[in-house]
Amino acid sequence: KQDAISILRGISIRMPLMIYGADVDNEDTQLTIDNFTSLIDPQSWDEFMPQGVTKQHFNHFKKYYDPDIFSAAAKRIRAMARAADRLSVEQRIQRITSIFSSFRNPDKETVLTPWRVVNMHLGDTLGGYNFFNDNYAATIDEPRFIDHGKPTDDVFRSDAHILEINSKSGLYPLYMAYGIYRARVKESMFAIETVDAEQRLWDKTVAE
């Protein structure tokens, strides 16, 4: 019994993050306890779920979850993410990182680095656009630029490409992508004045 409770607790802690990252092409499609495993890619499942808990194991344990409560929680998490899509890039980043801050670390070995720590780490080493004030006590509405000279210039070029092979939540690549995005805004031949224009350039930056 205790083993089953421990496994259920381990699964439950991880569910919100995995629901957030579920591969859902059509947001009108309801995410349910029955289709949950089919919407999570194998690599993410192996990375985040407790060791030894396969999709087959989950399907055995899913009978202990209330389907209606699961669907309602999933709908709320996905709605929070979708709402960010209608905001400016800066506001969207603030909203996304706020959502991530509500997720619990899956276990002692899998730590979701807080957004503040990401900004401290990359701000101190590479520079770029930082979302916290000078002493990292609070977020700021307009990101401040930290210039470390050549390292900053080399990394945050408009044509730079970032390979991040160990990202769990995606906050490190998010910081890097925003710096490259701002370089592209600066070099753009056309004024980026609408949310739609921002979104097109942001999507292109992330895709490349």
Where are these regions (language model features)?
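Class I S-adenosyl-L-methionine
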Residues: 2-207
